[in-house]
């Protein structure tokens, strides 16, 4: 839920980043959205191809760090580096899909199948509540400190959650892969 607080609000700002910081146009906005979606499809396909023998909780934490690094570096790019922004966007899409598929697998392996649907429903409903607050805060932040700084701050926060999660042994024990 904590990561969603930062990812969801920043994800809606990719078109604004394209227009304002990179002086892009409708094609650039479409390209960025397409790369995010393509990265998500690629990440989902890679995760769905076979079962990986890796601790999925560690994978989730690593993907937090990858997403955070990509967002932070996106905010540090000069206005002439749109192609690099596009690459970071695609990587963020891949990492998001790996995170989501790993998260679902961890939940499925730890929750009784009789209540799994309700647990996922409650989780996703609860995770959207802080996202709404994050959207309000991110809009205010972007208006007052700039969109690039907002990307940097969100990236740093997401990385901190990823690194912090590695420090919790109880998290690692949620998956025995």
Positions of PLM-derived features:
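C-terminal transmembrane bundle of multi-pass solute transporters/carriers
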Residues: 14-177
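Pair of pore-lining "gating" transmembrane helices in MFS-fold secondary transporters
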Residues: 1-9, 90
């Amino acid at each position: 839920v904590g990561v969603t607080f930062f990812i969801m609000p920043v994800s809606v700002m990719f078109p604004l980043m394209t227009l304002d910081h990179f002086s892009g146009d409708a094609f650039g906005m479409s390209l960025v959205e397409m790369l995010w979606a393509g990265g998500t499809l690629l990440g989902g396909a890679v995760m769905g191809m076979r079962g990986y023998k890796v601790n999925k909780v560690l994978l989730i934490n690593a993907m937090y760090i990858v997403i955070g690094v990509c967002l932070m570096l996106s905010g540090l790019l000069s206005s002439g580096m749109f192609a690099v922004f596009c690459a970071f966007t695609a990587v963020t899409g891949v990492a998001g899909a790996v995170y989501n598929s790993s998260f679902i697998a961890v939940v499925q392996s730890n929750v009784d199948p009789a209540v799994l649907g309700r647990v996922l429903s409650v989780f996703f409903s609860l995770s959207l509540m802080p996202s709404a607050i994050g959207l309000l805060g991110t809009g205010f932040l972007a208006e007052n400190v700039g969109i690039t700084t907002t990307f940097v701050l969100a990236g740093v926060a997401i990385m901190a959650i990823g690194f912090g999660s590695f420090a919790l042994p109880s998290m690692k024990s949620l998956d025995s892969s």
